Amino acid sequence: MKQDTLEGKAKTKNGVKRLCFSIVCILLEVVFIITIVTRLNEYAEIINLFTRILSGILVLGLYASDKTSSMKMPWVILILVFPIMGVGLYLLIGLNGGTHKMRERYAKIDSKLLPMLSDNQECLNRINETIPKAGNIASYIQRNSQYPIYQNTDIVYFDEAVKGLEAQLKDLEKAQKFIFMEYHAIEDAEAWHKIQDVLEERVKAGVEVRVFYDDMGSIGFINTDFVKKMETIGIHCRVFNPFMPGLNLFLNNRDHRKITVIDGKVGFTGGYNLANEYFNYTHPYGQWKDTGIRLEGDAVQSLTVTFLEMWNAVSAKDANDPDFSKYLFHYDYAAQQTGFVQPYADSPMDNEQVGEEVYISMINKAEKYCWFMTPYLIITDEMTHALCLAAKRGVDVRIITPGIPDKKFIYNVTRSFYHGLVKHGVRVYEWTPGFCHAKMSVADDCMATCGTINLDYRSLYHHFENGCFMADCQAVVEIKNDLIRTMGECRDVTDQYQTGRSAYLRLGQLFMRLFAGLL
């Protein structure tokens, strides 16, 4: 297949119908609200006064919040300039973190789950002694997310998603006790059918199988009877945050995690979902670049905990009476590798942006180079400052983004960040064969990350995410080498974005950037 070949993106009929129905319902709700407001003209002064008071309260609350200025400013402007729309949107999606009830549920589950992980203090001391800058980051993760650092874990890096899928299928066939799978998107098509065939066989062998997916991420890929179909063949299946019309303060928080756990001994994570395009079975955006890792050993416990958190959080019953002990246990394993690995999770239910802080910490600690690959580049002032400051210090800072976008508007917003970065020495590359969906970073030949966390507001602030911090292991070298190979297939657009832009383009980009935090 030629690199520039593009194919239509397959969609399931029922999924598309449900999406269209939901959108129509939401539009009708908006029309209804506007109609009600219009008919209440006789109370215009009272409504106007109430809206202004509420707007003032929300703006003061935003000002006093711990959010970054990049997150506050769009909402402040929207609320002050368009009070009714701004207040409505902020109450719907801007609160970020759902209801108090949901926060309590997650806190309750975490209070039971996370203490079951060993603090591995000796391992933490070891990394602080041998690689202090990586140790600082590991300490931050452990103190603020309670996910420990591990050794005694073998890591396999996959530079193509299809290699990860092939390895997963082999390991799934060996499952004896349980299989946990959590993904943002599942497509009821060829790639999933390969997995489903194996899962059915393992169910017949007495293996407990759980599948968990995000409704919004999968809405165009699977039909509404998917859960019922899974349950019929013995697979326990749950849906995260079903997308329905109506007021839903939790709507904007999606499960973007990608995890497979087999018997608590083997785990997979990375950037790819379980849909055909991720494995280049179809090509809606040219070639697809995605990556992943396989863990075997002690560190898999953290992936198990991350899965159990989400699985139990969607059920009030499970949140109150969970039984985790049979899935979290120690077993004898002698790893061939000696490096450090730290799977971690990030949640919008707290006020700690673990994903962003790990990236910024790597940038700040880097002395020679710090490279990133991301499908989207929509970042806060804090991260922009860190990237630019590192480049000014003489650190080789590079970012790889797609050459063919999956969302053109978001792509334009991504490109709007280029000029502000390259003028300070950051180099930007666009992968010409297609869409790079991988989320990776590497610095100074000693530390790297691989996981689900994009360099955009949605991943860093709104979504449930997971990543894996690695230090002093072969996977770090392999990630660096993969990025070097990938850059060889890129166009270097650094010089192109050094020059000034037209007033019209600057105005358009300023508008897009202003509301980037809402994307």
Annotate each PLM feature.
Residues K439:
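Catalytic-core elements of nucleic-acid end-processing and repair enzymes
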Residues M373-T374, T401, W431, C450-G451:
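Thr-Gly-centered strand-to-loop micro-motif
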Residues R427:
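Surface segments flanking catalytic/ligand-binding clefts of nucleic-acid enzymes
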Residues G355-F372, K392:
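Long hydrophobic segments that form regular secondary structure
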